């Protein structure tokens, strides 16, 4: 690991402390504001320098996509967009980690998934929520699952009958997704075990 300049150390310490206190990395704007930079672009340049020195990793496409590499990572990983054919928990899909005790969920949460859309709103799962997921393939009919259909990931209520799977929305405006197991690729990524709703985290 290369030696950090005093300014780079300030940025690194700010990121580490922000994660410790709020459970998530700061945005570029927050770094700029707290350290007196003229703009978020100045913060971005310092982040790039830290990334070149191997102490952080920048996750593209995420405003809080900063991962510390100097210390052992803790907390629950937030999974971002998943590329077709790749594992859900592949390192490159993890936007950041939230300092939440996995054991607060039963069974314990292995990862968080950002909810997109309102198909499950009738049971309180809203667009932008962070869905806590226990990674397992052992699920039963009627449970809320994270499923992958032909490389598309979705959150729905499971109903399996023979070679047919019905993935049911909890919103009357959304039709069920019907999967023919003889013709389509289908897998269970996990069981929904809770929801985190915080406008600051979305």
UniProtKB/Swiss-Prot annotation:
DNA-binding region positions on the chain: 28-48
Site entry (Cleavage), positions: 84-85
SUPFAM superfamilies assigned to the protein according to its UniProt record, in alphabetical order: LexA/Signal peptidase, Winged helix' DNA-binding domain
E.C. number(s) listed in UniProt: 3.4.21.88
Entry's Gene Ontology BP terms: DNA repair; DNA replication; negative regulation of DNA-templated transcription; proteolysis; SOS response
Key word DNA-binding present: yes
Stored Gene3D superfamilies: Umud Fragment, subunit A (2.10.109.10), Winged helix-like DNA-binding domain superfamily/Winged helix DNA-binding domain (1.10.10.10)
Quaternary structure, from the entry: Homodimer.
HAMAP family named in the record: LexA
Name recorded for this polypeptide: LexA repressor
Species the sequence originates in: Pectobacterium atrosepticum (strain SCRI 1043 / ATCC BAA-672) (Erwinia carotovora subsp. atroseptica)
């Amino acid at each position: 690991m290369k030696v950090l300049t005093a300014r780079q150390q300030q940025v690194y310490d700010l990121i580490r402390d922000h994660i410790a206190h709020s459970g998530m990395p700061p945005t570029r704007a927050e770094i700029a504001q707290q350290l007196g930079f003229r703009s978020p672009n100045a913060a971005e340049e310092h982040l790039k320098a830290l990334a070149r020195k191997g102490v952080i990793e920048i996750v593209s496409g995420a405003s809080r996509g900063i991962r510390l590499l100097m210390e052992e990572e803790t907390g629950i990983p937030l999974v971002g967009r998943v590329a077709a054919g790749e594992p859900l928990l592949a390192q490159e899909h993890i936007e950041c980690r939230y300092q939440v005790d996995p054991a607060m969920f039963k069974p314990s949460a292995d990862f968080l998934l950002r909810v997109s859309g309102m198909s499950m709103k009738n049971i309180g799962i809203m667009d932008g929520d962070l869905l806590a997921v226990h990674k397992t393939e052992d699920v039963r009919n009627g449970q809320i699952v994270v499923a992958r259909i032909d490389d598309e990931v979705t959150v729905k209520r499971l109903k399996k009958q023979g070679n047919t799977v019905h993935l049911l929305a909890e919103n009357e405006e959304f039709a069920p997704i019907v999967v023919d197991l003889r013709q389509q690729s289908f897998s269970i990524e996990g069981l929904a075990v809770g929801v985190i709703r915080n406008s600051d985290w979305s």
